[in-house]
Amino acid sequence: MKVVLSDGSIIGGGDLISAIYRTDLVPVPVSLEMVVKATDELKGLLGISDKLIVGDGISLTIVKSQHINMQAVKAGKRVGGLIIIAVLSGCEPLLSVASRATSLNDTSFNEVYRVLGAKIRLKGDIKLNQFICLKGQLPTKRIAISLQKEAAVTMYSDGEISVTRINDLFKGESLIYDRSALQWIDNPHVLSHGNTNFLSIDDNGSDILGSPLNNKQVGYYPRADARELQNLRRILVTKAKMVRQLDDRLNAGSVVTVDDGSSQDSLVVLTAAHRYDTGALGGRPIMATQAWLAQLEGEK
């Protein structure tokens, strides 16, 4: 994996031990976990807030840099290493608890990200009736709740972040795989546990909005209208997992069509992790992709 440092140099294969490049359908959709040898040069370039460039010019900012002693021994001494975690540049302010309260009405996700300190612009956007993040709350959690109320997700594609409704995820071009390439998750309790049937109270303070469904958890959502309650029933449920040789086509938001010759199922990638082990400390190199695939549940 090619990792470019802030001075323009590239981490060599002898210094890079392992890396996992990951995309998710979450408010901060791109991250990199990396272990490198703790050389003097790298220690000076891999500190908190330092920049990295990976892939097709994807800019990441380091949010964690930790020195460790590894099991490998060289010249009678344990080899030192650095554990690095980096996220999409501009999103790092969202990882700290809010230093002040934010309350917005008739707003959008673009405005929410900006007010919370993120230095990015969303390609696709959705209007919001209201957004609240109190002082001391985690911005990413508050954004995720708002996304859930709009039946939407955040995704990274073609160098940009966008907010996309869950229904629209399945309208893109799909990648076709044989059913045997997937490990199917057969758990009848996943849907009943994951798809909560939310209820709310009308503005008059007495009428209950929403109706409980059989075999579903029931939860209370304050000040939610009928549209939002309906959106809360529309979720992505993990149905399968795929592990294969490195396949950089698989990223969060990619549509996968599973074909067994007689029928086809459409799934979307919830999380994709691309793993690179260089074998710098011994062992064989590994380049592999693991993806978690989900199906839309709830009314479309």
Regions picked out by a protein language model, each given a short descriptive name:
Residues 37-120:
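Surface-exposed cap/loop segments at beta↔alpha junctions
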Residues 1-18:
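Polar/acidic, low-complexity leader/linker segments enriched in S/T/G and N/D
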Residues 77-82, 122-194:
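Short beta-strand-centered interaction patches in the first periplasmic/extracellular domains
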Residues 65-76, 167-170, 268-281:
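Short, compositionally biased
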Residues 34, 97-120, 135-158, 253:
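Amphipathic, non-transmembrane alpha-helical segments in extracytoplasmic/periplasmic proteins
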Residues 3, 48-60, 253-261:
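Short conserved beta-strand and strand-loop elements enriched in small hydrophobics
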Residues 94-110, 140, 156, 167-178, ...:
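Ser/Thr/Pro/Gly-biased, low-complexity, turn-/loop-rich segments
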Residues 17-45, 186-300:
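An acidic/polar, Gly/Ser/Thr-rich interaction patch typically located in mid-to-C-terminal regions
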